[in-house]
Regions:
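C-terminal catalytic "cap/lid" subdomain
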Residues: 1-212
Length: 212
């Protein structure tokens, strides 16, 4: 399930992370299966990470879009591509544990199939974040765009962005990046040292996202 063969060239390709799940969904869609069960090491999709919050509740159902949102924000139960394909092929997914198969998992389905939808579906936590703070930045058009363009050129995904209202020609700019991009980001930010009075980094943060 982790590799595929191109029909025209017969070349073997590795599908990458989540390839087995992706293959299962594709087969389920092709044979028009009622459901595709994905077995992991947890009983299903929880309202938040049960390893951090013991009172987290297992969800009976969640929509494709909400599952994709949780996954993009740090929840690591299901891989994004498998959920995207399930939505495209209209395949109902069930996430459940291979260690406790007697426990009903979580159904990932179309939103209209969920009769009683909670206001908040889940809370995603991402501890692999670094806050980059630029203080006393020259407040003129194009500075922020230049910074973010340089980061994008290095394939650094900038997430949360906060910029203060300019005072006396100066402004403060804060944004978050993945911890894995920290060292590369430092190299990029060195080019903008003259544009700010101070640049600092804080890796002791956690991003909390509410999905609903």
């Amino acid at each position: 399930g982790f590799q595929g063969v191109a029909l025209d060239t017969l070349r073997v390709s590795t599908l990458g992370r989540g390839g087995s799940d992706l293959t299962a969904v594709a087969i389920a869609g092709a044979i028009e299966a009622d459901v595709c069960e994905i077995y992991t090491d947890v009983d299903g999709i929880y309202t938040t990470d049960p390893r951090i919050e013991p009172k987290a509740k297992k969800l009976d159902k969640i929509s494709y879009d909400e599952m994709l949102e949780l996954a993009s924000l740090g929840a690591k139960v299901l891989q994004n591509r498998s959920v995207e394909m399930a939505k495209k092929l209209n395949v109902n997914l069930v996430s459940r544990s291979s260690f406790t198969p007697e426990v009903e998992g979580t159904l990932i389905t179309k939103e209209e199939n969920i009769m009683e939808k909670p206001i908040v579906s889940g809370i995603a936590l991402d501890k692999n974040q670094v806050r980059v703070g630029m203080y006393g930045v020259t407040d003129k058009p194009g500075i922020a765009a230049s910074i973010f363009t340089s980061l994008a050129d290095e394939n650094i995904n900038v997430d949360m962005i906060v910029q203060t209202v300019g005072v006396d020609g100066k402004t403060d700019l804060d944004f978050t990046i993945p911890t894995t991009d920290w060292e590369i980001c430092k190299g990029v930010m060195e080019k903008f040292q003259t544009q700010a009075e101070n640049i600092d980094y804080n890796e002791k943060i956690c991003k909390v996202s509410i999905v609903g």
